Amino acid sequence: MPLGLLWLGLALLGALHAQAQDSTSDLIPAPPLSKVPLQQNFQDNQFQGKWYVVGLAGNAILREDKDPQKMYATIYELKEDKSYNVTSVLFRKKKCDYWIRTFVPGCQPGEFTLGNIKSYPGLTSYLVRVVSTNYNQHAMVFFKKVSQNREYFKITLYGRTKELTSELKENFIRFSKSLGLPENHIVFPVPIDQCIDG
């Protein structure tokens, strides 16, 4: 009897271990950077200012019909050293939430890394790439990070206003799908007024 319980315990432990491995490998793999365009002749001074997050897609983003994602805003403030102070303003738990970080210029114009990355436990790399923008209406930005040895990526569709044309949204969907994301990993946050209009 004790031997039978031991085998049962080992079998359950093995099943739990296999399940844990499955849950860490269920992320859609990040695409190679060769599949992610870079905005030519990126103009850092024109990109700064407030952007509304009109669309979001990523391997850790899932559409929630019962509790849809609320729109938030991100402000890029260009500093003298050509890095950006980046502040995202979100409405959470009935109050305004601010997330502040620094994006440091990378190898090419329009590409950035996260400044002071060591202050983010578990984060080993963080890349930002401006895919396309016309500066005064819309932008598409690709983010990739490695956290706790897991690779996450997302694409953000920014608008200078809360509404963008259906053509721009369709283009965003097409691009997200070209990077391997299915429809349920693509969301269009619900426009709100709280916190993001100040």
Curated annotation (Swiss-Prot):
It holds the Pfam family Lipocalin. It is found in: Secreted; Cytoplasmic granule lumen; Cytoplasmic vesicle lumen. A carboxymycobactin binds at residues 72-74, 145, 154, 158. Induction: Expression is activated by the oncoprotein BCR-ABL; BCR-ABL misregulates expression via the JAK/STAT pathway and binding of STAT5A to the promoter. Induced by insulin. One of its GO terms (cellular component) is extracellular exosome. Enterobactin binds at residues 126, 154. GO terms for biological process: acute-phase response; cellular response to amyloid-beta; cellular response to hydrogen peroxide; cellular response to hypoxia; cellular response to increased oxygen levels; cellular response to interleukin-1; cellular response to interleukin-6; cellular response to lipopolysaccharide. Disulfide bonds join 96-195. The modification Pyrrolidone carboxylic acid is found at residue 21. Keywords: Apoptosis, Cytoplasmic vesicle, Disulfide bond, Glycoprotein, Immunity, Innate immunity, Ion transport, Iron, Iron transport, Pyrrolidone carboxylic acid, Secreted, Signal, Transport. This is Neutrophil gelatinase-associated lipocalin.
